[in-house]
């Protein structure tokens, strides 16, 4: 009886499928996020699921060594809701000059999301906004030197970013 079926592989999440379509390999849960930052990305409720993650920086480092690359994409799902993607960039926020770097990284990421092979990741990113969440997050790696209401904070807000924060809670 060599007719036994192999056990079915677990169904890929929408985030994992979207990553594959973009030619990338998603890691399970939040595991693509560097260990020291992983615990600082959390769901507002305990039943939030992390459906996959991408290390964009590592994926494009060789092809685009000089680019200001965004770091991490994370798939999330809340009960009864559509899966969505958020993008997290751990980066120093100690000086105002870092704002330009973050905005350059955001330009890079949005350029990727506009490419045809990233269409599914863009749709998941749009689903994030449709559920009332910020799509892009600057995670401060230390002291935050950017004050709410400052010119720099306003520049970030104009691009859909909150001022940097040491935790990302969605």
Where are these regions (language model features)?
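Acidic-basic catalytic patches of nuclease active cores, encompassing PD-(D/E)XK
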Residues: 1-65
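Short acidic, S/G/P-rich loop/turn micro-motifs used as interaction or catalytic elements
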Residues: 60-64, 92-97, 143-148
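Conserved alpha/beta core surface patches that mediate binding of polyanionic ligands
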Residues: 66-70, 109
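Ser/Thr/Pro-rich, acidic low-complexity intrinsically disordered regulatory segments
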Residues: 67, 77-79
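Conserved catalytic cores of phosphodiester-cleaving nucleases, focusing on short active-site segments
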Residues: 72-74, 84-95
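Mg2+/Mn2+-dependent nuclease catalytic core
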Residues: 94-113
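Short, basic/hydrophobic alpha-helical segments
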Residues: 110-130
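Domain-level recognition of nuclease-like catalytic cores that cleave nucleotide substrates
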Residues: 123-170
């Amino acid at each position: 009886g060599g007719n036994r079926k192999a056990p079915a592989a677990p169904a890929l999440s929408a985030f994992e499928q979207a990553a594959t379509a973009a030619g990338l390999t998603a890691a399970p849960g939040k595991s693509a996020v560097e260990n020291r930052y992983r615990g600082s990305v959390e769901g507002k409720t305990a039943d939030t699921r992390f459906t996959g993650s991408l290390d964009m920086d590592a994926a494009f480092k060789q092809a685009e060594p000089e680019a200001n690359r965004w770091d991490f994409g994370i798939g999330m799902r809340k009960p009864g809701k559509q899966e969505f993607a958020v993008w997290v960039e751990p980066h120093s926020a100690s000086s105002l000059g870092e704002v330009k770097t973050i905005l350059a990284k955001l330009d890079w990421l949005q350029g990727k999301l506009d490419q045809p092979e990233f269409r599914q990741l863009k749709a998941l990113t749009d689903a994030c906004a449709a559920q009332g969440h910020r799509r892009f997050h600057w995670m401060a790696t230390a002291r935050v030197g950017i004050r709410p209401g400052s010119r720099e904070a306003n520049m970030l807000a104009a691009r859909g970013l909150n001022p940097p924060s040491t935790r990302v809670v969605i």
